[in-house]
Each structure stands twice: as C-alpha cells, then as structure tokens.
Amino acid sequence: MPSIDINCDMGESFGPWVMGQDTELMPHITAANIACGFHAGDPDVMLATVRAAIAADVAIGAHPGLPDLQGFGRRVMAVTPDEVYALTVYQVGALQAIARSQGGRLHHVKTHGALYTLTARDPALADAVARAVADVDPALPIYVANAAIAQATRERGLRAVYEVYADRSYQDDGTLTPRSQPHAMIEDVDQAIAQVKRMVKEGVVRALSGKDVPITADTLCIHGDQPGAALFARRIRAALEAEGIEIRTV
C-alpha cells in the first residue's frame, strides 16, 4: 500500500502575535515542524506546541531558521558554515530538550525559509546543517528537497526524507517554481489533490511546461499560514485515504 507523511510548519506565533492555524490543522497531519525561536516562536509557544503534538500523537520536528524575526526567516542572509552549524545545534537542541521534558521525543529536523533555500543550493551550508544534526542525534532524519541538502544528509549517514508540496508548482528540474514567478502557487484544491496523487502513486509530477518529472514523495508539506489551510489539509487527507494511500509518520 502506498503511504505518505503529512507535515506542517507550526509554533510560529510569538508572544501575543498569532501565526497559522495550529489547533485546526493538528488532527489532519502526522508531523509538526516546530519553530525554535529564531525566525518565529518563543519558549512558551514551543512548549505549548510540543504538548499539543504529543496529545494528538503527531511527530515532533525541529524547524530551525535564520535569526530574523522581523523577516520571518525568509530573507537570505550572508552566513558562514560555522554560523549555520551553531544556529542549527542551538535550535534543535532547544526543541529536543522541551520535547524530552514533556515525555516526548524529537522525530526529525526540517529547515525553514531562507535556510531551506540556502541549504538546497549551497553544499557547504547543507553540510553544516547535516553535520549539526548528526552531532546532536544521528538517528534524526532531515526532511529535504532533492538538492544539495539531500546529498549532504546521506553523506553524513542520516536519513533523507524527501518532501513534496501540494500547493506549489514544479519546474522541469524537479525544483519548486519560485514564488516570484507566475503560477507558483496552486490554489485549486482539486488540482492540488490530483498532483499529490500522482506524486505518491506514480512517482511523477507534471511541471509547468507540461513535462512529467520524476519525484520522490516521502512527506507532503501543508502550509499552515494560508487562508483555509485546515480545510485544505482535511480535503487532501480524505482524498488520499479514499485512494488507498496510507497516511502515516515516516
């Protein structure tokens, strides 16, 4: 039976400011990528999100980002491999400690925003993240795009969990269409469902050019900060289960 994990970025509120639809989304996912205080989140939010994930039997993931609260971690910064190593160890270690304090355990790591982009294309920064995760806990998989970070993850002896998106279009090389370009986002739920079905069952995705591109789909990312995200997640999960696709943590 084909299967897929469903992950969502969570815990991205900060103080009284609320981001995302965490409560509504939690029942529809199998893994939560929890912000660790650098691009979003704070200790109280991290703790509350970990508790909610444990209560819902959702896997707990660390979601480290660049130190950029104002830019939500989406602005590219000039960072060195040593800086990326340090900020990754710091954030992953913090969430790991919170999870343990509540009787849970850290399940995976997924980088956020600009750090995700940088590690997809820069082998040195990708290796810095992989080395940091391996040094914290070599049993932790990393959720990756099929890019530099995937190779670095494998070379460090870690498991690479390949991530796909329902609401993003793809290019001929298997990369996501940049958000700055037309048709980068897929807003029609039926189109998104059809795309995910093919990725899971056939291992291909239809690029914007019309070309079918090979793709590995281990985990599906749902964007929790989009309007109607909870309904979107519920409909996608129901459609996949109706196709005989098992929804489970990797």
UniProtKB/Swiss-Prot annotation:
Record field: catalytic activity: 5-oxo-L-proline + ATP + 2 H2O = L-glutamate + ADP + phosphate + H(+)
GO MF annotations, alphabetized: 5-oxoprolinase (ATP-hydrolyzing) activity; ATP binding
Gene Ontology biological process terms in this record: carbohydrate metabolic process
CDD domains: LamB_YcsF_like (cd10787)
EC top class named in words: hydrolase
Keywords for the protein's UniProt record, in alphabetical order: ATP-binding, Hydrolase, Nucleotide-binding
Superkingdom per UniProt: Bacteria
Function: Catalyzes the cleavage of 5-oxoproline to form L-glutamate coupled to the hydrolysis of ATP to ADP and inorganic phosphate.
Oligomer and partners: Forms a complex composed of PxpA, PxpB and PxpC.
Stated name of the protein: 5-oxoprolinase subunit A 2
Source organism per UniProt: Bordetella bronchiseptica (strain ATCC BAA-588 / NCTC 13252 / RB50) (Alcaligenes bronchisepticus)
